[in-house]
Design a protein with these regions (language model features):
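Surface-exposed assembly/interface segments
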Residues: 1-251
Length: 251
């Protein structure tokens, strides 16, 4: 059922890691995370988390640590007030689909599949989940969104995503208002992965000359131009890379 829910969102690829039940659960869970650390993926969900609610904070901290290490991992977790752009705090419950009612824990898989399947020009905001008959509706949806909660709403005809936000809601340091939006973080992560991949595959190991630096910067700017044409970057913004020179002078 969880995999079927994920595929409703039409993700390009799905990785499945298995964890044992019973006394070996924690060991196999840690082994699964270790395997995932060195794989390429974007969105994580853990459909069987509800019996192990104590792991929610541990899992969110793992994602945050991986992002600090320049990974672009993100996760959909239930009722997780992480205040981090890499965590989507799914907070709707009482989700009725046919004869079955799902909790937030159980429906995170559907949300992860939805987010993974969106193109870079699409937002999660107002995306319709047509299979849902009803939900336990929030009495304070605007306040929930402001607190970094990803919730579903019923407009009287259909159930849909209220707004495509992650759990970031208290800004500090280099965190900006735009970074509360899942779509913005997806674009930032895409550029980080693509530029790093281009550098590692085409420029590491060659002479670090000025001409080669100029070639790399030109390739990045050409890449930015492509993102503008595709609608990922705003065309009226200054989407350019350059070489920064710092000269130290002795007094």
């Amino acid at each position: 059922d969880y995999l079927n829910k994920i595929f409703l969102g039409k993700p390009k690829r799905v990785l499945v890691e298995r964890a044992e039940t019973g006394e070996n659960f924690k060991k196999s869970y840690n082994a699964a995370l270790a395997r995932l650390r060195n794989k390429s993926w974007n969105w994580l969900t853990f459909p069987g988390l509800e019996p192990h609610k104590d792991l929610t904070e541990e899992l969110q901290n793992w994602i945050i640590a991986q992002r600090a290490a320049k990974k672009t991992f993100k996760a959909v977790l239930p009722c997780s007030a992480a205040n981090n752009e890499g965590i989507v705090n799914f907070s709707s419950s009482g989700i009725k689909v046919g004869a079955k009612t799902y909790s937030a824990y159980e429906y995170c898989a559907r949300i992860a599949g939805l987010l993974a399947g969106l193109s870079m020009t699409e937002s999660a905001t107002y995306q319709v989940l047509s299979e849902i008959d009803s939900i336990t509706e929030s009495l304070t949806p605007n306040e929930d969104i402001d607190e970094g909660k990803f919730i579903l709403i019923n407009d009287g005809e259909k159930v849909k995503v209220a707004r495509g936000v992650n759990s970031l809601h208290i800004l500090s340091g280099d965190k900006t208002e735009d970074m509360k939006k899942i779509k913005i973080i997806e674009g930032m992560d895409l550029m980080r992965d693509d530029i790093r991949s281009a550098f590692e595959n085409n420029y590491i190991g060659i002479n670090n000359s000025y001409d080669n630096k100029v070639m790399f910067v030109a390739a990045i700017n050409q890449y930015f131009d492509g993102l503008v044409r595709e609608g990922v970057l705003y065309g009226d913004a200054e989407n350019t890379a350059d070489i920064l020179w710092i000269q130290f002078c002795e007094s």
